[in-house]
Amino acid sequence: MRWSQCYIPTLKEAPGDAELLSHKLLIRAGMIRKLTSGIYTWLPLGLKTLNKAISIIRSEMNRIGAEEILMPMVQPADLWKESGRWDQYGKELLRIKDRHDREYCLGPTHEEVVTHLLRGEVRSYRQLPINVYQIQTKFRDEIRPRFGLMRAREFLMKDAYSFDQDNEGADISYHTMFDAYKAIFTCMALDFRAVEADSGSIGGNFSHEFMVIADSGEDTIAFCRKCDWAANIEHAATLPPQTKALTLEKSMEEVVTPGQHTIKAVSTFLTIPEQQIIKTILYTIDNKPVAVLVRGDREVNEVKVKNMLDATVITMATPEQVHQWTGAPVGFAGPVGFTAGPIIADHELMVYNDWVVGANKPDKHILHVDLARDVQNITFADIRLITDADGCPSCGREIALTKGIEVGHVFKLGTKYSKSMNAFFLDENGEEQLMVMGCYGIGVSRVIAACIEQNNDKYGIIFPPPLAPFEIMLINLDPRDESVVMKASEIYQFFLSEGIEVFLDDREERPGIKFNDADLLGFPIQVIIGAKSLANGIIEVKNRKTGEKSSFSLERFFTDFYSWRDTVYVTWGLS
């Protein structure tokens, strides 16, 4: 491919509404253009990159025996009402009506459609297992679509669905897909981690996320420095207490704390550490009041609370609700005498018995509180966010936190959808059984953005070879010099004959512009030829990832290039 024959509208500056680095670089590199909020057009170079990701994914799906299908993007409301998600999914589900006033939605996912498909086709256990996948456009009506492809409303996704006779078979399907995802992201040369995760709106009882490590990631990942344990911070378990506190001999004491409505203020006012204070946070959970307790220096993990109660909606109480339930303003709520609803305390609070809590009265706290002695209707559970001061829940060793971008998610759904949608088969005894399902997604367009978030520098994108639009940028510095044009054409034809994807910059532009664009586009290898180097009998090459340059003699270029190219692949962990 020659630049003079291509449409690549590069920009010196990104638009003002582009926030995330990948968004800025994709626009500057002429790979995407915004149509409207959260919806983008893929331009030729960007589409070539997207197709690279699709090819890797499709190859691995086919290798494990998954069969490709294509389901409709427009889905009838009846299926979503049957599964119960029509009302649960919320405003992210874009609902439409046809001319006959029938309700539909634009599919954000396809569990209902694929379950409906196979419940009408599968009759016998002999037809199972089945594993199908598609690569198709999805739509989620995000309230504030931001960050370009990272949180778009319309996006490309690979979603796969497995159907098995029993849990044992479902486990095999799950782990087969789990290993396939590891192979996919390894093939893409991405630095990633597979982490334990919450199943969210998809449902199910077991899931893993695949996270690309990047400082700009929205998700926080906890991982062990010694063993293989890793989890999304929302799902990361904390170690249970090894001991429990003895009953406190001191009696409770109410004290005046005027205007001290934060943990820090109470700590300073009473000259006690924040770790001795209990933070009481009130929630409305499925329209019922619940008090949640954590240590003063800790944070509540709302996902854990929601899962513990098997709840659908969790929201923090308003100041008016806090006053209604406790008789006190925000900052003075506490568990002693709280009767508006159940109390859930983090299990860490069992190891100590001399707490300071809000008194449920304005400007007052209570000292010397023993939760086991002084609080009724209390349940202890793991409900806090893990920190890097905690031990690994698997081996007890040191953990660390890092940021990541979710690019894939695998779920063991069980019978959530097959039960609600009556997806039965006849077992070997002729009895009806529910199909056991799994679902597995990769955000294909998101992979490209995540790749760029992980691989960039101040000059532009640094594509790993498997995802680069072209492997080689061949730069002709003197397109008006016939000898340079001929040598560049010779090298260009050589790469094409070897099956190497090469892009020839044959524009009549200044060398500085060509170098800047080459770095912006981020192809892994740059091959540079100009009148000066040609006169000296050399050709220059550059590893875009490391910035290292080398020179080869004209006579030995075609033989020496391959060994040098191997070193470029090694820098990406590829062979």
Curated annotation (Swiss-Prot):
Top-level lineage group: Bacteria
Catalyses which reaction(s): tRNA(Pro) + L-proline + ATP = L-prolyl-tRNA(Pro) + AMP + diphosphate
Localization per record: Cytoplasm
NCBIfam families listed in its UniProt record: PRK09194.1, proS_fam_II
Assembly and interaction partners: Homodimer.
Biological role stated in the UniProt entry: Catalyzes the attachment of proline to tRNA(Pro) in a two-step reaction: proline is first activated by ATP to form Pro-AMP and then transferred to the acceptor end of tRNA(Pro). As ProRS can inadvertently accommodate and process non-cognate amino acids such as alanine and cysteine, to avoid such errors it has two additional distinct editing activities against alanine. One activity is designated as 'pretransfer' editing and involves the tRNA(Pro)-independent hydrolysis of activated Ala-AMP.
Protein name: Proline--tRNA ligase
